Regions:
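Core catalytic lobe of class I
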Residues: 1-181
Length: 181
């Protein structure tokens, strides 16, 4: 199963995996009937249970999700799903924001809500997360000296990113209804 691509229902694929087989899952599943996927049914409870089963004890699941607005209210599906993963036994390790550079449906000047331009990236773990953070944020205070001319408390040249990740999204040359960076 390693280094393979399976173009099938994820429940079929995961059913062939042993317990604790996966170290990292990053996925952005369909949500709130925003798109039609030619007869695909999104069985969230079954998918969540299988993800928990196949995730390694030190594994991580990144669930990228958003909410539709229906009858003037956001659905809250993202939060219900996050709570369900926690109910199954996952720990909510981090709540991150995936900020897009543009929106398919920008707010109008006379609208009563702002342009929806982000999705949640819920980072779940079964146990302790040992992976290192991406440290590519340049520190403007690195090498700074105090008034006496001494090197102030050492500040590294680079620090970990924040939990808001900005991505440029594009559909150039991509024939997918929901492109992902």
């Amino acid at each position: 199963m390693l280094d393979s691509i399976f173009n099938e229902n994820c429940l079929d694929t995961m059913s062939r995996m042993p317990d604790g087989f996966v170290n990292l899952t990053v996925t952005s599943p369909p949500y709130d009937d925003l798109r039609e996927y030619e007869g695909y049914e999104f069985d969230f409870p079954a998918i969540a249970a299988e993800l928990y089963r196949v995730t390694h004890e030190e594994g991580v699941l990144v669930w990228v999700i958003g909410d539709a607005t229906v009858n003037g209210s956001e659905t809250g599906s993202s939060f219900r799903q996050a709570l369900h993963f926690m109910y199954l036994g996952f720990k909510l390790h981090d709540t991150m924001i995936y900020e897009k550079n543009s929106s398919t449906f920008p707010a109008k000047r006379n609208s009563n809500r702002y342009t929806q331009i982000f999705e949640y990236m819920f980072v779940f773990a079964k146990g302790r997360v040992e992976a290192g953070l991406i440290c590519d944020k340049r520190n403007k205070w690195a090498g700074h000296k105090d008034y006496s001319g001494k090197l102030a408390n050492p500040v590294p040249d680079f620090s970990p990113r924040t939990n808001i990740w900005r991505y440029v999204t594009s559909t150039n040359g991509v024939k997918h209804p929901a492109p992902f960076p």
